[in-house]
Design a protein with these regions (language model features):
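Substrate-binding/active-site clefts of carbohydrate-active enzymes
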Residues: 228-405, 415-418, 423-434, 438
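C-terminal accessory region downstream of the catalytic core in glycan-modifying enzymes
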Residues: 546, 559, 600, 610-611, ...
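The feature marks proteins involved in alpha-glucan
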Residues: 2-15, 20, 56-117, 138, ...
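Conserved, mostly hydrophobic/aromatic
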Residues: 120, 169, 225, 275, ...
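Short, surface-exposed alpha-helix to beta-strand junction/turn motifs within ectodomains of secreted
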Residues: 29-48, 126-134, 141
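Conserved alpha/beta catalytic core and glycan-binding cleft of carbohydrate-active enzymes
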Residues: 191-202, 427-573, 577-583, 625, ...
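Short proline/glycine-enriched turn/loop motifs at strand-loop junctions of beta-rich domains
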Residues: 28-36, 121-127, 665-666, 675-677
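C-terminal beta-strand-rich structural cap/linker in extracellular carbohydrate-active enzymes
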Residues: 122, 163-167, 693-717
Length: 717
């Protein structure tokens, strides 16, 4: 090595790149030819011949005569000319992936009072150190050398008690030193500047509440909310605004003496809260988190294993965020509400700066055939979950959140970017848990550089029977196109969406293996709220008519086969004042307006009534398509009205027969009912109740415009 350095300035060789496990591509300066024959590779262990296998314009492909030494700095030698070998394209080969796959479960930090062990997967690094700091803001650390194993894992053992010591890794990759955060870090400093060696026992709760069994995913009612939105408002009675612990506060009320916060969630009767991202994300300065203009949904993850610091009472404390998220989850469990995490594994925030790219350049992110960054996510990078160690990282993270934080489910953002094998491995891992874990995701078919037949998109749903998918076709059929703001749907005057409505209310059996795969919704954090969408379509319509359309849309979701999903505030016509994408808008756009909730308490109670009916009656949440085909009978299908009969329910339900009518017209509909039985109304245009609202005295029912009615009989019960 040393004798070659002085000739490096010759610059006849422009670059040397390791393409595969046995091939180096040399690029020559334009003034040079490829006539030279005497090619070698050299490192501190000696030098070995290279064989020319292909010559092209200013490039030569060279075949190695022995396995490449990944633990050495290598140079290509030709006569008096030399060039360092850059380990680059090879990391995206199957051979590299298989050779360096590490199946162990000790990546990151393993702490005891007697010894701390650290491990980082850095297969192309030739040197790795760990730097220890007494304070998170220290600039100079104490350096310890790590040793490498055959799978590219670098380790160090630190004798003594290193609890609450901060650390970074220092890796030497492609002739460059880089200081990086541990990708498997479990505790972080403010803004994730350093990782902390922590004792998990210091964040454990004395006892976790016991959850009552949930017999089936079909029993779920999901309620999606953002930590800051839900707690930041001035009129909610919550003290710890914008923080995890704000959602643990009981007994909070608004100025109208109506309950708020976690008590409100319990009163609604939902079974699951889906939290928008709580993994550490990069767009918020955690030291300035109370600024009302300093807001983000959090879909810009930087660390897979650590909670977001801006929601902690003290983001400078490495333990605070972990302890307080656990307290939040336990508080919801106490109310018998399960927790779904919205996880972002499809991309990373500023990929160039991520520790994954710094440690193993080119491995963790998907590339096109032209070696450009794949960008199906639309944010500059796609995570290459199909690679062994990327997939392992996702599965490890899921396992960690279940075991350490008692999470009950995961919503995979842009799941269609990820591959089906990864999602199968995730589902398999969740089966190891001591409780049922629910997985759902966005199965959008996005333009990433990976074959669609191998990705977790809706068209592959039958390959993933344990995973649920957002049913966007039903969504758009109900309210109109999400991406064309003025295009109407069933509830707003579209005569051509009835087929999607019929499919959706039956559980979307054309798409899925079972009803539990269908996530039915009309509103989520993305895009316009339902209210704002309806205002776009009908800008001059009376408020009362808009409210009827809104209630109709929500009632369709709540009564359909599959799993209903509500966006927080949907039950009281939540608005974001026309903002179509509020991901970084100020609090006044995104926050929960509890005054509006109070004003529309009657509608809140209407949705609560639908929730009670659904939870009390299995006929609305049948387990199989076989059962749906047996009991579901279409009575009427018109462009603006659908009526169906859930019949012969027998032992399935306390009600013998149920008739559901969704009238999207501006006129009253007269719907015939089966004769020779007593029919009772439990849902009309004003109320939804387990106790009948009225008895129907004839063989038909007059259904009000823009409303849902449910009629039942229970003659044998």
């Amino acid at each position: 090595m040393k004798q070659k350095k002085e000739s490096f300035v010759n610059h006849q060789i422009k670059s040397a790149i390791l393409l595969t496990m046995d091939t180096i591509r040399v690029t020559l300066e334009p003034s040079q030819s490829g006539d030279a024959k005497n090619w070698k590779i050299a490192n501190e262990g000696g030098e070995w011949p290279l064989t020319i296998i292909e010559v092209a314009d200013h490039t030569i492909d060279l075949l190695l005569s022995k396995p490449y030494d990944f633990d050495q700095t290598n140079i290509v030698v030709c006569d008096s000319d030399t060039c360092y070998v850059e380990v680059r394209d090879v990391v995206r080969t199957d051979e590299f992936d298989d050779f360096f796959y590490y199946s162990g479960n000790d990546l990151g930090v393993t702490y005891t009072k007697e010894q701390t062990k650290v491990a980082v997967w850095a297969p192309i690094a030739t040197k790795v150190n760990i730097l220890l700091y007494k304070k998170w803001h220290d600039e100079t650390g104490e350096r310890y050398t790590c040793s490498r194993d055959g799978k590219g894992v670098w380790r160090a053992e630190l004798d003594g008690d290193y609890e609450s010591i901060w650390y970074l890794f220092e890796v030497y990759v492609n002739q460059s030193w880089r200081k990086v955060i541990d990708p498997y870090a479990k505790f972080l400093s403010i803004n994730g500047q350093k990782a902390m060696i922590g004792d998990h026992a210091k964040t454990q709760l004395a006892q976790w509440p016991k959850l009552e069994p949930l017999s089936s995913p079909n029993d779920m009612i999901i309620y999606e909310l953002h930590i800051r939105d839900f707690t930041i408002g001035r009129n909610n009675g919550i003290k710890h605004k914008g923080q995890f612990v704000g959602m643990t506060e009981e007994g909070t009320m608004d100025p109208h003496h109506l309950i708020t916060g976690i008590d409100y969630l319990e009163r609604m009767g939902i079974t699951h809260v889906e939290l928008l991202p709580v993994q550490e994300f990069g767009s918020i300065d955690e030291s300035n988190r109370q600024d009302p203009n300093h807001y983000n949904w959090g879909y810009d993850t930087t660390h897979f294993f650590v909670p977001e610091g801006s929601y902690a009472t003290d983001p400078y404390d490495g333990y605070s965020r972990n302890r307080e998220l656990k307290l939040l989850i336990a508080s919801l469990h106490k109310k018998q509400i399960r927790v779904i995490m919205d996880v972002v594994f499809n991309h990373l925030y500023i990929w160039e700066d991520s520790p994954l790219e710094q440690i193993v350049p080119g491995y963790f992110f998907r590339h096109t055939d032209e070696n450009e960054m794949s960008n199906g996510t639309g944010v500059g990078n796609d995570f290459a979950a199909e690679r062994n160690m990327a997939r392992k990282m996702i599965v490890d993270a899921i396992s960690y959140w279940i075991e350490e934080f008692h999470v009950d489910g995961f919503r995979f953002d842009l799941m269609g970017i990820l591959d089906t094998e990864t999602m199968k491995q995730v589902a398999k891992e969740t089966k190891k848990a001591t409780k049922d874990i629910f997985i759902l995701g966005e199965g959008w078919d996005l333009p990433t550089s990976y074959p669609p037949e191998l990705r977790a998109i809706t068209d592959q749903a039958r390959e993933l029977p344990q995973i649920a998918f957002f049913q966007d076709r039903f969504r758009d059929g109900i309210k109109g196109s999400t991406f064309e703001s003025i295009q109407p749907g069933f509830v707003s005057g579209n005569d051509f969406s009835i087929d999607e409505i019929v499919s959706g209310v039956r559980g979307s059996m054309e798409l899925f293996s079972s009803p539990k795969q269908a996530i039915n919704y009309v509103e989520a954090h993305d895009n316009h709220t339902l209210w704002d969408k309806l205002k776009e379509i009908h800008p001059h319509e009376e408020t009362e008519l808009l409210q009827k359309r809104h209630r109709l849309a929500t009632s369709i979701v709540m009564l359909s086969q599959g799993i209903p999903f509500l966006h927080a505030g949907q039950e009281w016509f939540r608005t974001k004042y026309g903002c179509e994408n509020s991901y970084n808008q100020p609090d006044w756009v995104n926050q929960f307006d509890w005054n509006q909730r109070a004003y529309f308490e009657k509608t809140v109670n209407y949705i609560r009534g639908l929730i009670k009916i659904r939870r009390a009656h299995p006929a609305f949440r049948m387990e199989t398509y076989k059962a749906i085909k047996e009991h579901f009978h279409l009575m009427l299908v018109e462009s603006d009205c659908i009526a169906y009969h859930l019949r012969n329910l027998g032992e399935l339900d306390r009600w013998d027969d149920i008739i559901v009518i969704h009238n999207a017209s501006l006129y009253k509909k007269r719907i015939p009912l089966p004769k020779n039985t007593d029919w009772y109304v439990v849902v009309d245009d004003h109320a939804a109740s387990l106790i009948p609202l009225s008895k129907i005295g004839e063989d038909c029912v007059n259904v009000s415009p823009l409303s849902t009615w449910v009629c039942v009989n229970y003659k044998t019960k």
